[in-house]
């Protein structure tokens, strides 16, 4: 499924923040983004596949595999395999999804794998509170790309 990035970015307007997710802890970054979305900010996340999840590799794999296997093809719940969709789903879990306020906030978020050509020259923001090297001293972590590959995604 090809995404028309220029059309997607035009829908956001001119005043949006670009955040580079590489090296950030997924949960911490998602909570910061969710709060900013609720405050009305428009956010674009790039390099979503390079976000990390801390913990033992196989424990993380099993936790995500259990979520993915939970639903049936007919009834759901449907859990994504694409790294950018897993990222969006994580942010969605931190928003009041059942209210219009949460859904409106969710619509102000755009997530991309890699850096689209339209965003090459822009300044990327890093969230210091969510950086793995600043927050955690652990060497046990998995990237979102590895989790996606384990779930069966072949694009990374």
Swiss-Prot record:
Molecular function terms, GO-annotated: mRNA binding; structural constituent of ribosome
Xref: Pfam families: Ribosomal_L13
Domain of life: Archaea
Listed InterPro entries: Ribosomal_uL13, Ribosomal_uL13_bac-type, Ribosomal_uL13_CS, Ribosomal_uL13_euk/arc, Ribosomal_uL13_sf
Keyword Ribonucleoprotein in record: yes
Keyword set, alphabetical order: Ribonucleoprotein, Ribosomal protein
Any Gene Ontology CC annotation: cytosolic large ribosomal subunit
SUPFAM superfamilies reported for this sequence: Ribosomal protein L13
UniProt record, GO biological process: negative regulation of translation; translation
HAMAP family in the cross-refs: Ribosomal_uL13 (MF_01366)
Subunit structure: Part of the 50S ribosomal subunit.
Function: This protein is one of the early assembly proteins of the 50S ribosomal subunit, although it is not seen to bind rRNA by itself. It is important during the early stages of 50S assembly.
PANTHER family assigned: LARGE RIBOSOMAL SUBUNIT PROTEIN UL13, RIBOSOMAL PROTEIN L13
Membership in a protein family: Belongs to the universal ribosomal protein uL13 family.
Record's protein name: Large ribosomal subunit protein uL13
The species this protein was found in: Archaeoglobus fulgidus (strain ATCC 49558 / DSM 4304 / JCM 9628 / NBRC 100126 / VC-16)
Gene responsible for this protein: rpl13
């Amino acid at each position: 499924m090809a995404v028309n990035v220029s059309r997607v970015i035009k829908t956001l307007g001119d005043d949006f923040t670009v955040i580079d997710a590489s090296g950030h802890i997924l949960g911490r970054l998602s909570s910061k983004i969710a709060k900013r979305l609720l405050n009305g900010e428009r956010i674009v996340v790039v390099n979503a596949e390079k976000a990390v999840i801390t913990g033992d590799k196989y424990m993380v794999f099993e936790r995500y595999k259990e979520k993915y296997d939970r639903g049936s093809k007919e009834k759901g719940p449907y859990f994504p395999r694409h790294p950018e969709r897993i990222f969006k789903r994580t942010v969605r879990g931190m928003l009041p999804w059942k209210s219009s306020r949460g859904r409106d906030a969710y619509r102000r978020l755009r997530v991309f794998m890699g850096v689209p050509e339209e965003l090459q020259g822009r300044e990327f923001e890093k969230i210091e509170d969510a950086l793995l090297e600043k927050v955690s001293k652990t060497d046990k972590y998995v990237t979102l790309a590895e989790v996606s590959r384990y779930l069966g995604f072949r694009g990374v």
